[in-house]
Every structure is written in structure tokens, then in C-alpha cells.
């Protein structure tokens, strides 16, 4: 793997744009990893913990707050040819919010599917699953969509500090078995706690390996 001048997660990240429709997508440049999950799965909190910046991705107690594809990149790059950031993180709209109007849900669904299907620089989607609830029907629907689009994805359990520690290995094994036959699923399942910091280095390393950057911290 090539070395990069700066570690992926050892310096500040910045928000570059929100994408309400494909017309607003940035030009394809650095490799991208995306984060998907049900509303209030802790997606924004995990991104903030991952980069060590509390206010980067906006968190909210209101489900369905993220309605766009939100792009984040490491700071310190001009974005011009020869000075591109090594990667981008894409925070995807949360799904499964029962109170969202159907028109809004349809809009999110189209945006997400079009992005997944047509983004050549997208290397992997990290699908976040609340460790207290496991894989639910809406999650299965998203995994079906990713399998259909042939987009590589990896399951990341969140909020493991909310369950008893001895339950985590069992949950990891059960989750791995549930996705074993899915064609686009990466076999390793990760567990994380944004609150305690557990598993964050494992996720950072996984992302570094995915985008081909050896120096991730």
C-alpha cells in the first residue's frame, strides 16, 4: 500500500458539501466510503468519533435529520490535480424513519440507489446496525439493494456500550452468519462504541485498507 504524507485520521477533517440530488455530486476524484444505517443508529456520532471531531457530522435526537449525502474529506488538500485528498467519507440519509412523509422517503431512496449504482469511486459502504436491536427488516432491504447493485459493504455494530460485554462476541458471530451467503458482503463484522471509543481503531484500519492507505493514524 502506498504511504500518504499525512495519516488519514491524525488531522482535521472538513465538510465539503451536502448533496440533495445527483446533480450536486462532486466530480469523481478521491476514493469514497459511505456510512448507511437506520435513523438514530448513531451514524453521525460514529463519524465524529472516527475522526476525533465532535461537531463534524451534525447529530440530532430527531430521526431522519440527515436528508442529503454529506461529504467529508481530510483538510489540507487543494482538491486540484496532484493534491487530492486520499479519500472522502459520505454520510448517507438514515432509513427506516416511520414518521417521514412517503414523498421524502421516495426521494431519499432514489438518491441513495442512484448514488450506489453509478459512483465508480465508491469502494465500500459501512452499514451500521444498532447492537441492541440487530438486523431488522429495513436493514435487510438495504443489504438486498447493495447486493443487487454489487456494491461491497461491511456490517458495523454500534452502541456496544449499551449491551453487556459478554454478549458482543456472540452477536458478532450471529451477525456474520446472517450475512454469510450475501454476495456483496465483506465477511468481517466490526463492533464499535462512539461513547467509549471501543473498536474505532479497527474501523479506521479497515477503512485505510479499503482505500489503499497504509498510514491511517
Curated annotation (Swiss-Prot):
GO molecular function terms listed in the Swiss-Prot or TrEMBL record: GTP binding; metal ion binding
Assigned keywords, A-Z: Cell cycle, Cell division, GTP-binding, Magnesium, Metal-binding, Nucleotide-binding, Septation
GO biological process per UniProt: division septum assembly
EngB-type G domain boundaries: 29-213
Pfam families assigned to the protein according to its UniProt record, in alphabetical order: MMR_HSR1 (PF01926)
Entry's transmembrane regions: none
Binding, Mg(2+): 44, 66
CDD domains: YihA_EngB
InterPro entries with a match to the protein in the record: G_ENGB_dom, GTP-bd, GTP-bd_ribosome_bio_YsxC, P-loop_NTPase
Listed cofactors: Mg(2+)
Gene Ontology annotations for the cellular component aspect, listed alphabetically: cytosol
Binding site for GTP: 37-44, 64-68, 91-94, 158-161, 192-194
Role this protein plays: Necessary for normal cell division and for the maintenance of normal septation.
Family: Belongs to the TRAFAC class TrmE-Era-EngA-EngB-Septin-like GTPase superfamily. EngB GTPase family.
Name of the protein described by the UniProt record: Probable GTP-binding protein EngB
Organism per entry: Rhizobium leguminosarum bv. trifolii (strain WSM2304)
